[in-house]
Amino acid sequence: MQDKEPLTKTEAAYWLLRRDILNTKLRPGAALKLSALRDAYGVGWTPLREALSRLEAEKLVTAISNRGFAVAPVSRTELEDLMRARMVVELPLLLESIEKGGPVWESAVVTAHYRLSRCKIVPDAASEEMADEWDEKHAAFHAALLSAATSSWLLRFQGTISDQLRRHHRFLGLAPTQRAAAGLTIGYETAVAALRDAMAIEHHAALMEAALDRDIDRARALMTEHIGYTLQVYIKSEDEDGELEPLKLRRGA
């Protein structure tokens, strides 16, 4: 077997930047200065520009006139739009999977759920490694639920939506602790409770059981409810300006 061809410099820059945008190491709204990126990733100007242009096409990066690039912001409006898109794309995929899935699909769903259930995480006190693991297992569970669907285009759209939602999920996980650290403790417990509820294994177990029971109506209702959890976390985490980050942090104070 031949070894895989090494990544080009542009591909390497793209995947490194993409990873750090999705896990919010590069924070939503943050300026992406080429000099800082070059030092951080050891990649030259041209590969960085090409990688950033590619990420802009995926709406993970925004181009700012005469100012370069920035990480795409996280917002309630964007989240609501993503949720609508997820409803349109993911529900038909789930229902098709339930109708067409056989023993291999059932086994994949059960295995993915078991692995997610073994991923113990405290949402407001998770390390980056713990959050990465939960993200991976959570995405794998939802991918398993949809894996018997046959529409390659819908699955591609679902992957794009999932990546964008991952950024929102990760930033939402940071928001309550950030606000508390900035002295804004009002609403902290409510926000953390909503975050824990959204990540609870019980919701995922109910979704798995409905799918395996071929209960279309229950699966549809549970997935619709599940998709709405992220918005509830946002609503309970935002400040009076509708922002997740305290004003003093947004200003760099």
Predicted regions and their residues:
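C-terminal all-alpha effector/ligand-binding and dimerization domain
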Residues: 171-253
